[in-house]
Amino acid sequence: MAKFRVVHYLNQFFGQIGGEEKADTAPLKKDGPVGPGTALNGAFKGEAEVVGTVICGDSYFAENMEEALKQILSMIKEYNPDLVVAGPAFNAGRYGTACGAVAEAVVKNLGIPAVTGMYPENPGVEMYKKSVYIIATADSAIGMRNAIPKMAALGLKLLKKEEIGTPEQEGYIARGIRKNYFAEERGAKRAVDMLIAKIKGENFTTELPMPAFDRVPPNPAIKDLSKATIALVTSGGIVPKGNPDRIESSSASKFGKYSIAGVKDLTSDTFETAHGGYDPVYANQDADRVLPVDVLREMEAEGKIGKLHDYYYATVGNGTSVANAAKFGQAIAADLKASGVDAVILTSTUGTCTRCGAAMVKEIERAGIPVVHMCTIVPISKTVGANRIVPTVAIPHPLGNPALPADEEKALRRKLVEKALKALTTEVEGQTVFD
């Protein structure tokens, strides 16, 4: 019997192209397994083989999703596969989003099964769990050894058209799909057993979990910008030189509050990024590419805004848990309200950074302050629940373009900030993207 044919999708890191400096790599293909594909091949135990690997840089995919998907699907089709495996992506936000999008596109457009793997808090999970099977993994590559066999086993079941068990049995993340099944015990007995366990304070598992919805209604728009105090917040890790609060480069446990009173421009001598989730070169050259102090100072001088708040707030969103992001957002919102801030511009960079930023956006919104999220990976911001969103240039320089002359780059940044201010002065009823 012929072996099933499998194509493996990887990012630039696991595809052995390079690190963050190669995140802009366009899609390419290689015959046979690459990197973790070798372990995947072994996990199939001779029933299937990885005939080809498609590799794409995380930033390239995030910034060119539609075109990247076309290229990737075309490359996958050349191998005539029976199954596509993507990742695992663990807690890497851009990678998870790409894995989910590729798997979904394969199922919908090629009509073949696909499997991926992610940490449950990866933003790609919320975006794609209903359309593809996602094996639950650890938050880092240390969990590769456990993830690969589970992905291979589920892939083989899909190939053989065998019945897929529950998430607990197979190891995939619950998809929100309910199915009738025959239980060994009657419903009345199961219900009473559950009630007794609850009364005793023992653990029990409901048979009908309810979906959790956490949407915050948008606040009314700012009526008069010329009298408004605008504050800057970022999950992009911009800190004073030396990172005085020692904010972690990943999975941050804190945020910082820093004075920009009298500061007209963020220079390389005084500000840098502490963020470990994107190439820091461009932000270290000019932190205004992540935190647009320069153009907001000009607008303040011109009377377009009443005042730029004397402090900005920063954390590192890379890998930061949703719980911590919400906690940061609540604390920042309380400080903003106490300071009389009228509106907030919040900027984000990479995938989990965008998730973190959007989680903070919701808490600031919940506190009654209108806020706009400026980010490159708009789908993540929408999935988490930001209301006013402005798409930006690129992950490592959301509010700049190093390829442009300085004056043109600043003009580009100003145009983006003007969009953000327009968003803050526009009434919206729900999520709105200001292109």
From Swiss-Prot:
Classification via InterPro entries: Gly_red_sel_B, Various_sel_PB
This enzyme's EC code(s): 1.21.4.2
Reaction(s) the record says it catalyses: acetyl phosphate + [thioredoxin]-disulfide + NH4(+) + H2O = [thioredoxin]-dithiol + glycine + phosphate + H(+)
Top enzyme class: oxidoreductase
Active site: U350
GO cellular component terms, semicolon-separated: glycine reductase complex
GO MF annotations, alphabetized: glycine reductase activity
Keyword Nucleotidyltransferase: no
Transmembrane segments: none
Keywords: Oxidoreductase, Selenocysteine
Subunit structure: Heterohexamer of two alpha, two beta and two gamma subunits. Component of the glycine reductase complex, together with components A and C. PB is substrate specific.
Family named by the database record: Belongs to the GrdB/GrdF/GrdH family.
Protein name according to UniProt: Glycine reductase complex component B subunit gamma
